[in-house]
């Protein structure tokens, strides 16, 4: 892969081709670069090997840092999710942005049933101002096809600010970031005109709702949202034919709590590495179940994310897009200590101060 990588530090990292703005089909007619923007959730500066993390393996992201450019003076717009993402999408300072916090919107009924599971009827967060243009709308107006896969957090179901109404051609993930606290959710959201969708719909996870949301049987659920979202992102890249530039926003929820993932080789590797590990007893009133192997779960989620990044880069190369694609990797804010997470063990935020929800620097 002969490409220059634009890799950033604490909060913004990326990869792109040296040909991105130079390759031409006709003289003096620059070809627009494809852009993939990857935003993970609650990852700190010090959680990657390229920034000194000694315990967690992140070879694909480390390679991006080694080959590319790091933005070491780049900062998130806010130390918490929704306003940070709003700053990115609107280009506004949080003092001017419509979204000031993780405000949640509910339906009139406080709960909804999925199988035997009583679920909170939270449907989303405060919407982006419909009078203010946002990033995917700008890209679409400039000839790009757009796709978003992961957390939205820029409106609630039925509002004027859902992906289908804000410049996104294809979407799969969580409209509501509160729902994203479950990695084995009762439902995900989708907008896919090719499947007949005329707006955002709910896709019920039929296998998951056979088992309860809380207690030991929760871990019998099999539909893991992070893997499903990544699969849809990969399918979207595969569908691109090079006739139109594409802009993808991959807002993976890893490594946000809850700390849980499939029992596969990634997790089992870290269970061996952290043989003397901690447990988390659950949190009353939250969505976080009791878990064992806290350090292994957290480390495994980051390595899993790194694997996703590697698959994205490989797919771009297979499709012949690597010479004209800019890939940016970033986090929405600093590391968290929710659901049993232990940022002190992993070095907190590297050389930076504070954690999620704290304003420093």
Describe the function of each predicted region.
Residues 1-30:
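Bacterial Sec-dependent N-terminal signal peptides
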Residues 10, 35-38:
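Hydrophobic, well-ordered secondary-structure scaffolds
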Residues 22-23, 45-134, 138, 144, ...:
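Active-site segment of extracytoplasmic enzymes that catalyze sulfate/phosphate-ester chemistry
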Residues 27-33, 40-55, 72, 100-104, ...:
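Active-site-proximal cap/lid insertion segments
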Residues 34, 60, 134, 163, ...:
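Amphipathic alpha-helical recognition patches that constitute DNA-binding helices
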Residues 36, 145-147, 248:
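Conserved beta-strand elements of the Class I
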Residues 142-156:
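Short, well-structured beta-strand/strand-turn elements
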């Amino acid at each position: 892969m002969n490409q220059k990588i634009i890799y950033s530090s604490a909060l913004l990292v990326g990869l792109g081709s040296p040909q991105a703005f130079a390759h031409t089909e006709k003289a003096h007619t620059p070809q627009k670069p494809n852009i993939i923007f990857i935003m993970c959730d609650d990852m700190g500066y010090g959680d990657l090997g390229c920034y000194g993390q000694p315990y967690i393996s992140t070879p694909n992201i480390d390679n991006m840092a080694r080959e590319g450019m790091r933005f070491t003076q780049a900062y998130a717009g806010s130390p918490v999710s929704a306003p940070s993402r709003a700053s990115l999408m609107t280009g506004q300072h949080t003092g001017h942005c419509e979204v000031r916090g993780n405000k949640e919107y509910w339906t009139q009924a406080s709960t909804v049933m999925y199988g035997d599971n009583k679920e909170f009827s939270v449907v989303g967060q405060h919407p982006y101002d419909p009078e203010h243009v946002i990033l995917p709308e700008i890209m679409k107006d400039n000839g790009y096809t757009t796709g978003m896969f992961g957390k939205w957090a820029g409106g609630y179901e039925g509002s004027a600010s859902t992906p289908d109404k804000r410049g996104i051609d294809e979407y799969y993930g969580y409209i509501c970031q509160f729902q994203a606290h479950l990695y084995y959710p009762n439902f995900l959201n989708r907008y896919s005109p090719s499947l007949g969708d005329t707006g955002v719909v709910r896709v019920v996870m039929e296998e998951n709702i056979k088992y309860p949301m809380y207690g030991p049987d929760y871990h019998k659920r099999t539909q893991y949202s992070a893997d499903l979202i990544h699969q849809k992102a990969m399918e979207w890249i595969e569908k691109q034919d090079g006739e139109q530039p594409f802009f993808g926003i991959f807002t993976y929820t890893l490594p946000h709590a809850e700390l849980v993932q499939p029992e596969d080789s990634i997790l089992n590797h870290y269970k061996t590495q952290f043989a003397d590990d901690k447990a988390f007893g659950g949190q009353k009133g939250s969505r976080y179940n009791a878990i064992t192997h806290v350090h292994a779960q957290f480390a495994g989620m980051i390595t899993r994310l790194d694997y996703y990044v590697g698959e994205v880069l490989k797919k771009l190369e297979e499709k012949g897009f690597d010479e004209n694609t800019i890939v940016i990797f970033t986090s929405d804010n600093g590391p968290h200590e929710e659901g049993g997470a232990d940022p002190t063990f992993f070095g907190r935020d590297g050389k930076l101060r504070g954690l999620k929800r704290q304003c420093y620097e």
